[in-house]
Amino acid sequence: MTEEKKYKVLARKYRPQKFEDLIGQELLVKILSNAINNERLAHAYILTGVRGVGKTTTARLIAMSINCKNRDKKNCEPCGTCDSCKSTTSDSNLDVIEIDAASNTGVDDIREIIDNVKYKPVIGDYKIFIIDEVHMLSKSAFNALLKTLEEPPELSLIHI
């Protein structure tokens, strides 16, 4: 028994780890790279499309690139080796919070996000919230999220 292998679903095992690995998203990558390079990031990004086009993957790559300590300045690729990149990849980064809105549809779930938004980042430069399947939120949960989307605290980014 040399090493215990950890099971990963295929979607996570082969999830792109660099912007160049995003197939069919060249224009999006160019726009995001320019925004990151010029330090002109929006406080929120809405990524839309059919299932499987890479919305969540893109949000995670943005988070990795923004908080990466050794980011390639030319093309904004995250290094994948710094503490921030490794912890984002392993879903243990305290500054990248991913919420599945399909399972957490209520106002209390969104209020938990709103409470976390006010805290400063721990490891990286930004605290990033990825709200997956946001269309599943209840109307009251959307209303609770609206003010935070309109006026987010400094150093916080929200991807929905």
Task: Describe the predicted segments one by one.
Residues 1-157:
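P-loop/Walker A NTP-binding region and its immediately flanking N-terminal helices
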